[in-house]
Structure formats: structure tokens, C-alpha cells
Curated annotation (Swiss-Prot):
This is Cytochrome P450 monooxygenase PC-23. Cytochrome P450 monooxygenase; part of the gene cluster that mediates the biosynthesis of the indole diterpenes penitrems. The geranylgeranyl diphosphate (GGPP) synthase penG catalyzes the first step in penitrem biosynthesis via conversion of farnesyl pyrophosphate and isopentyl pyrophosphate into geranylgeranyl pyrophosphate (GGPP). Condensation of indole-3-glycerol phosphate with GGPP by the prenyl transferase penC then forms 3-geranylgeranylindole (3-GGI). Pathway: Secondary metabolite biosynthesis. Its cofactor is heme. Gene3D superfamilies: Cytochrome P450. One of its GO terms (biological process) is mycotoxin biosynthetic process. One of its GO terms (molecular function) is iron ion binding. Heme binds at C138. Keywords: Heme, Iron, Metal-binding, Monooxygenase, Oxidoreductase. It holds the Pfam family p450. Its EC number is 1.-.-.-. Belongs to the cytochrome P450 family. It comes from Penicillium crustosum (Blue mold fungus).
Length: 204
């Protein structure tokens, strides 16, 4: 989904490539050499990190299921309503949480700048949680973010990506991916049709 969103927002893609060039260099070889000698440079890719966080906000991973333990009341109250939670499993809807306008202004917009340090409107603690929190926290979160940063670095410096769905393909709402609307029942968001793309080598 990151490639799709960046294709739809070329101004953000330009800013991202500028950051890559300033931090690690303008070609694959310079990037590899820079990361081998100074892997901490990945920490300087603030916009890259923000792009990944915003992508995961809009297209989050599957929820963590939590089985409710037996409690004395076995009932909870939420927004004036009472729920019986005996022997139930509770799941957090990340899609709903991540698109709340009180937590993320203009929630349907792809705006990675909201995640940059010093953003005008700070994001409340625990509002962004595609890797979940507490006992359900994903221990591989940091590794996953590092891998995705390196992937964007090495691909965007050399290639352009353009979605290429057939005209007869079913289309969903643009805010949920358009032709690449989320489908399937796996742990992560699966684009409809596999998100076919045309990949072009960038001119030097």
C-alpha cells in the first residue's frame, strides 16, 4: 500500500526521495555502503518512518483478540451501555480507531507529516497501534519497521511504481484503496486483486 499511496501523492514521494538522497545517497550502491558503515542512519529517515506509520494507520494489520477473564461483575459499561463479557473475545477495530477525527484530523487523508517530530497537532498516546500494545504487543515491530525502511530506500531510488488494474476490475471507495480495497481475512490487509503494478526503471 505504501507504493500505491506514494504514487497517488507525487509531492510526498518527491520529499521522500529528497530525504533518501540527503541521508544515504542517490543510488543503490551509495545506500548500501552508507548503511553498512553507519546503520544508525536509518534513524535519520524521519519522513520515511512517518510514511510507513501513516500507511499502517490507513491499512493496519489485523486486530489482537483478547479473551475476557472472569471478573466479579462480568459486565462492562461503555458510552452508557452495559455489555455482558462472560466467555467473550474482544477485538479492537484498528480501522475505526485510526480513522477517528478526534485522534487524527482529516483521518481519510494520506498525511505522513502528522507523524513528524514537532507536528502542530500531536497524536495522542496509544492512538496509533497497528502492532498493538500491552501483552499483545508485537515483539518484531522494530525489525519490521527497519526492513520496510530499507525496502523503500532500495526500491524508490531506482524504480517508479504505478498500479495497473484492469478497467473491468471492481472498485471500492478511494479512501479504502479504490481498486486496491482491502479484502481477505488474513492477519494483514490484502489488496483486492493483489495490487498489480507496472514497475519502471527510473532515468538517471
Amino acid at each position: 500500500y505504501a507504493f500505491l499511496l506514494l504514487h497517488q501523492h507525487p509531492d510526498i514521494l518527491d520529499d521522500l526521495r529528497t530525504e533518501h538522497g540527503q541521508v544515504c545517497g542517490l543510488n543503490r550502491q551509495s545506500i548500501l555502503l552508507a548503511l553498512q558503515s553507519r546503520p544508525r542512519l536509518l534513524n535519520d529517515l524521519k519522513l520515511t518512518h512517518a510514511v510507513l506509520k501513516e500507511t499502517l494507520r490507513l491499512f493496519p494489520m489485523g486486530p489482537v483478540l483478547r479473551k475476557c477473564p472472569r471478573v466479579p461483575s462480568e459486565m462492562i459499561e461503555y458510552e452508557g451501555r452495559t455489555y455482558d463479557i462472560r466467555n467473550h473475545i474482544v477485538a479492537i477495530s484498528h480501522n475505526s480507531l485510526h480513522r477517528r477525527p478526534d485522534l487524527f484530523p482529516d483521518p481519510d487523508a494520506f498525511n505522513p507529516y502528522r507523524f513528524l517530530p514537532g507536528a502542530v497537532i500531536p497524536i495522542p498516546a496509544d492512538a496509533w497501534r497497528p502492532f498493538e500494545k500491552g501483552n499483545g504487543y508485537c515483539v518484531g515491530q522494530e525489525l519490521a519497521m527497519i526492513q520496510m525502511k530499507v525496502m523503500l530506500l532500495l526500491t524508490l531510488t531506482e524504480f517508479d511504481f504505478q498500479p495497473k488494474y484492469a478497467r473491468k476490475a471492481a472498485r471500492g471507495p478511494d479512501i479504502y484503496g479504490g481498486y486496491a480495497y482491502t479484502t481477505g481475512s488474513g492477519i494483514g490487509p490484502t489488496p483486492a486483486g493483489g495490487l498489480p503494478m507496472r514497475v519502471d526503471k527510473r532515468a538517471k
